[in-house]
Design a protein with these regions (language model features):
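N-terminal, positively charged/glycine-rich alpha-helical extensions of SAM-dependent methyltransferases
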Residues: 1-15
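Conserved alpha-helix/loop element of class I SAM-dependent methyltransferases that forms part
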Residues: 24-42
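Class I SAM-dependent methyltransferase SAM/SAH-binding core
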Residues: 47-48, 53-103
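A short acidic, Gly/Pro-enriched loop at the edge of an enzyme's catalytic core
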Residues: 106-114
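Residues lining the SAM
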Residues: 116-120, 148
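A short glycine-rich, Lys/Arg-flanked "PGG" loop and its adjoining helix->strand segment in the class I
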Residues: 129-141
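C-terminal alpha-helical "lid/dimerization" subdomain adjacent to the S-adenosyl-L-methionine
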Residues: 148-202
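Core SAM-dependent methyltransferase catalytic element
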Residues: 202-246
């Protein structure tokens, strides 16, 4: 059985425990921030799916005073901790919190980017496409999605390496062994190629990996531009080619 993220005990231990479980946890968020900075405007609006206790929110808020965020999470306990964290750093005016799934948001394409970090591997396989579709539908035509999840892996050497990494990060040998034993119970993983195809079938394009540590993989997926936007872009290119500018 997966952990109960509505449990106060689980949530209180989450921030410390996640750094032991996920190799390169902090470097991951540095990568995400660097990529977002390279593509977003200073006034971007970002959707964070499964905001958890608010670590990625805090990290991004401290660096980007003009970005706005909408943060959703189905765990009220997680959400309350994230709200307190954001309030404590004086950034509540930049964040709208929503208790629930992405489907609880208004059905409008208003986000420049969406983050789904360590979330989709908890979603049942038959619900994954709907999960990504809800995100896709709420992105602007030029929006992008960034994900990071555990992939299906059958390579025993990678499992051994993961145990060594987690033990180096602070888990005991017994905890590492239990972690490996529980992977199939706690996660609904798919292979790298299946994950990529899932995003493409949802409607995303230019789907590629931006990060990997063992069986953890991060994807960037760009929303496919609408025909109207593509036609406008083509028109602008043609006008520029003929020396006409608006």
């Amino acid at each position: 059985m997966a952990k109960d993220f509505n449990s106060s005990k689980v949530v209180d231990e989450y921030d410390q425990h996640i750094r032991k479980l996920i190799p390169g946890y902090e470097m991951l968020h540095q990568q995400v921030d660097a990529i977002l900075q390279s593509v977003l405007s200073p006034k971007a609006h970002i959707l964070i799916v499964g905001c958890g206790t608010g670590y990625e929110l805090e990290y991004l808020l401290k660096k980007h005073p003009d970005w706005m965020f909408t943060a959703v999470d189905p765990s009220a306990t997680m959400l309350q901790k994230a709200q307190k964290l954001v309030s404590d750093i004086g950034k509540s005016d930049q964040v709208s919190f929503v208790h629930g799934e992405t489907s609880a948001l208004a059905d409008q394409a208003c986000f420049d980017a969406a983050l789904s970090i360590l979330v989709a591997h908890f979603i049942a396989d038959d619900s994954k496409k709907a999960f990504f579709q809800e995100i896709y539908d709420r992105l602007k035509d030029t929006g992008l999605l960034m994900t990071y999840d555990l992939m299906t892996c059958t390579d025993s050497q990678q499992f051994q390496a993961l145990q060594h990494l987690c033990q180096h990060n602070g888990l005991t040998s017994t905890q590492c062994q239990k972690m490996i034993e529980r992977l199939h119970q706690d996660f609904s993983t798919v292979r790298f190629d299946e994950y990529q195809q899932l995003l493409l079938k949802t409607g995303f394009e230019h789907v590629y990996s931006y990060s990997q540590i063992l069986m953890y993989q991060g994807f960037i997926a760009h929303k496919k531009q609408s025909n109207a936007l593509v036609m406008q872009d083509s028109k602008n290119v043609a006008l520029t080619h003929h020396g006409i500018k608006h």
